[in-house]
């Protein structure tokens, strides 16, 4: 299903199917849902919510310089960092919802390394973003 934001700051929630979500402009919160989703925040400081049941999400335009961040929805406090420090390839840390691992992979074969977050067998890929570009304050909720 294609879901398009209005260009204002909003919360956009996907379905249990495979969704293509585009937040457009604005500081959006994007929750893919249980399906295999492609998430694009657009301009603004966007928050991409990664749940333990998210299955498989790909974020196409993650940009920490714009203020983008990932929220791990695992039952912890969304204002508390799930991990404090710089992320790196092979890092593993425990959260309330399970173990989160960080990997550096070329997900789409374009020759650019991407970040893979894995929780309990579910994956989120941040295209064009290295783990070293993320810090603990970018990964919230634990």
Q: Where do the language-model regions lie?
A:
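Glycine- and aspartate-rich repeat motifs characteristic of hemolysin/RTX-like Ca2+-binding segments
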Residues: 1-58, 116-118, 132-142
């Amino acid at each position: 299903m294609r879901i398009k934001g209005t260009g204002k700051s909003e919360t956009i929630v996907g379905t249990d199917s495979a969704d293509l979500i585009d937040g457009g402009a604005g500081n959006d919160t994007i929750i893919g849902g249980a399906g295999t989703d492609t998430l694009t925040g657009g301009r603004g400081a966007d928050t991409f919510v990664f749940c333990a049941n998210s299955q498989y999400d790909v974020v196409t335009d993650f940009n920490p310089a714009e203020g983008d961040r990932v929220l791990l929805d695992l039952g912890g406090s969304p204002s508390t960092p799930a991990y404090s420090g710089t992320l790196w390839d092979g890092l593993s840390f425990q959260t309330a919802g399970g173990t989160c691992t960080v990997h550096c992979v070329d997900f789409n074969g374009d020759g650019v390394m991407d970040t893979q977050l894995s929780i309990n067998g579910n994956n989120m890929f941040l295209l064009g973003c290295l783990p070293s570009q993320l810090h603990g304050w970018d990964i919230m909720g634990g």
